[in-house]
Structure formats: C-alpha cells, structure tokens
C-alpha cells in the first residue's frame, strides 16, 4: 500500500488532492485550481478536466465508476504510485481496458485474488478480483487498504453495476 517506500523517485508521496479533483466549482462557484492561482498558492492552473462525480445519477455508469475508482484507488493505482507493480491503473490516466483491469490477470494480489483469474470479468462481478477486494474486510485482502474500516456499500453497488453492464468476456 502507501507504506511502500520503493517509488520510482525513491520518495514517499502524501495522499492528497490532484488537479482534476480541484477542477470544479466549490462554495465560491470558482474552479478551485484557478482560485489557488488568484490566492498566490499556484503559479498557474494545471491542465485538468472537471471530473465526473460518482454520485451524479445523470452521468453514465462508466463515468461514475471511473470517478469512484479514481478517488478511492487512483492514489496508489497509478503509474507512479505504490501499487504501480500491479499494472492496474485506476487514476483515469490510461483508457485501455486491460489497464483498468478488464481481463487482466493479477500480478501482485497474492491471497487477495480469492482464487479468481481476472481483476475484472465483464458481466460477472462475482468473478472479479476488484470487487472481491472491495468487499473484503480482511487486512491482507481489502482495498483500499488505507482510510477504510467499513465496506462501502454504495461504492460496491456502483462497481457491481458497472461490471455487470460491461460487454465482452475473458478467456477461461
């Protein structure tokens, strides 16, 4: 998890907001990145799209699921994160289905794979490692491993729906 010290640059990185999470209006109805520039905290606003909200019922299930995984998993599951060796990229930076876990065999899940073959099996949430780990409360299996003591039923329902709606199949 984020206790791993072997990052590409050899440094630990704190959990915190990323540019896309601040690219939306807040209480003052301003883009928060632009507001930070006005306040002198940033030299310039980073390029960032306004993110979808996982709670936005008007957004597609795909967009909502991606937003949920980004906010809850992307801090470790990104190319420079503590879970970079898993090859499961959930921060929204890679669009290839395999990078998001579709038909991807686990690299570093160990016992956390629950005897399943793929991170995500389209149409089959009950055969998907991603959901298995989200539903687990075992410390060596549960995801995310930081900042969580309860199983998030709303998030699980969303990810189940997303996987159930996915077209395709994986090799047996």
Sequence positions of predicted segments:
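A short alpha->loop->secondary-structure connector
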Residues: 8-23
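Short sequence/structural segments immediately N-terminal
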Residues: 1-12, 65-70
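Electron-transfer interface patches adjacent to heme c in soluble/periplasmic c-type cytochromes
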Residues: 23-66, 75-81, 89-171
């Amino acid at each position: 998890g984020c206790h791993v010290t072997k990052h590409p640059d050899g440094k630990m990185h704190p959990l915190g907001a990323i540019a896309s999470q601040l690219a939306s209006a807040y209480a003052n109805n301003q883009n928060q990145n632009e507001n930070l520039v006005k306040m002198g905290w940033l030299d310039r606003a980073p390029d960032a799209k306004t993110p979808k909200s996982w709670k936005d019922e008007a957004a597609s299930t795909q967009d909502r699921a991606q937003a949920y995984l980004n906010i809850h998993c992307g801090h470790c599951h990104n190319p420079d994160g503590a879970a970079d060796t898993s090859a499961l990229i959930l921060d929204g930076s890679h669009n290839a289905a395999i990078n998001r876990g579709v038909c991807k065999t686990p690299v570093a899940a160990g016992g956390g794979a629950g005897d399943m073959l793929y991170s995500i099996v389209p149409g089959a949430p009950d055969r998907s490692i991603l959901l298995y780990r989200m539903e687990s409360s075992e410390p060596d299996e549960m995801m995310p491993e930081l900042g969580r003591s309860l199983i998030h039923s709303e998030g699980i329902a969303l990810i189940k729906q997303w996987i159930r709606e996915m077209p395709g199949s994986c090799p047996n």
